[in-house]
Amino acid sequence: MVEQSRETPAGHRNGEPLGTNLLRIAAKARKERKLKFVNLYYLMTEELLLECFRRLSADKAAGIDEVTKTEYAENLEANVKELVDRLQRVAYKPQPVRRVYIPKPGSDKLRPLGIPSLEDKLVQSALARILGAIYEEDFIGGSYGFRPGRSCHDALRALSQTVEWEGTNYIAEADIKGFFDNVDHDWMMRMLAHRIADKRVLRMVKRFLMSGVMEDGETRASEEGVPQGGSISPVLANVYLHYALDLWFEKVYRNGCKGKAKLIRYADDFIVCLTNKEDAMRFPAELAERLKKFGLEVEPTKTKVLEFGRDAERHARARRAKPATFDFLGFTHYCSRTKDGRRFRMKRVTSRKKFRAKVAALKEWLKRIRMKPTQWIMQRLGLKLRGHYQYYGVTDNYRGVARFYHEVRKLLYKWLNRRSQRRSYTWAAFEDLLRALPLPKPRVGVHLFYRGRMTV
């Protein structure tokens, strides 16, 4: 029999901090894995919504309500109080998201985003905090995307540890076709019901799923999918893949393996490391069959198994060939050796696709802002370079960030000389400018080695 927890709002009414309530819920979820939470909706308070408002970025795009954070703040307390009143009466109805399209990195395709109205952003953020307190205790160690205290770099560290120290011989790559657009709403609600029995919370989540999309002035219903762009989307996506993929991998597929197998997932992007060839070769078909049950498909052209690891590197050297490579989280991973040549190492460099996309995006940005004052351009460009180094400046990828730095210099020189009626630069004058207003030099600041035993 599944036990139910009826959280009482009394503690919160008596002044118990919101964070304490969420921590207590997380502790219960961690201790009692089959517990269903019956009373969570009382947490949708002014305190929580005000905190969500403070966390909201001021430069976020507006939804169909066209209300900005600055405008909402003009009468903040009254606005939030009235919002809470509608929530408690369960009279709150989300508005359709505003559909926009952004370029997909490294591709001519566009990625659809759904921009919620301002109050929808607040309510989504509050629901995400509540759901996260429960499901963060359930998610497996191999899941890294959109989770507190975890990052892409943590996923890459786990990958290095697995490939270099756990005998990986094969990598299985898979791509879920249009994951966010194909989430089945009925399955989503059934998955949430495993842990949540508060009908008001479930009803509000369902309303967001069904809120619709406005595009070119027309509203259409959303019968499936989770719009990318809302703060509740990442936690819902993680819940869906937790049940559809992660638990199946841990409890079914891996238990049937002859060798070791490990899943490393960041949102809907994932890699499987395996030691046994037979296990590796059966993975794509079994994955496709599993995902089909939940309305998802694998992209056949992006799903493959390759030999990769210590043995793969040795086999390739024996036949004077290069070992296979694979891309994950913006990096191309390849087989190599330590500097002294004595030990196998997996190394990584910025993937060609991501590199080209980053250079193209920077080119468009420089073209657009080239008429700004030179000092303004140099300051903003410095921030962009630092952001690039913070992500791509990882162990073994100095040449990747250095190459990007040199491409940036060439683009900057080109576009500073395309400003009408402005001073043109010779290369010597441009070098003088860089000495006066220096750009941050390429650096590796993220080390992807584990010191000591890794736990997941």
Regions found by a protein language model. Give the residues of each.
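Non-catalytic terminal/accessory segments
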Residues: 1-456
